[in-house]
């Protein structure tokens, strides 16, 4: 083999490694879990009134701390609320890509889904205790992805009437848990909380005074 042939083969091998490297890096970046340092929940009364805003934060990002609630959820009884979630990464500048995580989740809706769980019977709608233990259980989602599957950035909740005769034994305090799953290529009509990576898992205290 002459010198020219050797150089030609070496160039071909180097080019193959370069192309292979480019093709394998990008999907990994696309499927990386989201970095979330602050979550804001806004409960807006459907029939008008002052929104209830609570938040959770994780100032060290990928460090040892987890997202922790800063507030307790306190909702009026017998009231319908629209809940919206805002997720941000405060380790990035507001103008940088990767700051507004809720927008990324919306854009990649076919890869993400929020699951909700709560103390049984705190809400008249949805009923039950949420879909963390079973995907088939009821949550009222008001947003969908491109395949018409729920995302969960927007939901609707109606609290029980604590003064009604039929609910006098129902607890008015409990917990409200939100889990965000990252399910690229896995999300479907039955994929539950055990499928995919967990981007977020927070449990708030909740009270109906």
Regions found by a protein language model. Give the residues of each.
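Exposed boundary/loop context
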Residues: 14-15, 123
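Bacterial N-terminal signal peptides that target proteins for export
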Residues: 1-11
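First exposed extracellular module after export/assembly in secreted or surface-exposed proteins
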Residues: 30-209
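Bacterial Sec-dependent N-terminal signal peptides
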Residues: 3, 16-41
């Amino acid at each position: 083999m002459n010198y020219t042939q050797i150089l030609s083969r070496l160039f071909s091998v180097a080019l193959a490694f370069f192309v292979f490297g480019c093709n394998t890096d990008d999907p990994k970046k696309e499927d990386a879990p989201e970095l979330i340092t602050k979550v804001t929940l806004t409960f807006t009364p459907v029939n008008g009134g002052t929104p209830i805003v609570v938040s959770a934060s994780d100032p060290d990002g990928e460090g040892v701390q987890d997202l922790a609630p800063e507030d307790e959820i306190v909702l009026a009884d017998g009231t319908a609320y629209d809940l919206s979630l805002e997720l941000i990464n405060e380790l990035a500048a507001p103008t940088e890509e990767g700051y507004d995580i809720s927008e990324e989740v919306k854009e990649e809706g076919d890869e993400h889904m929020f699951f909700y769980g709560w103390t049984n019977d705190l809400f008249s709608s949805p009923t039950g205790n949420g879909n963390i233990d079973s995907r088939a259980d009821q949550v009222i989602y008001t947003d969908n992805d491109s395949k018409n599957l729920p995302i969960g950035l927007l939901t609707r909740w109606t609290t029980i009437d604590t003064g009604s005769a039929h609910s006098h034994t129902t607890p008015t305090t409990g917990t409200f848990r939100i889990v965000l799953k990252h399910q690229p290529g896995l999300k479907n009509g039955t994929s539950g909380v055990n499928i995919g990576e967990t981007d977020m898992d927070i449990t708030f205290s909740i009270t109906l005074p």
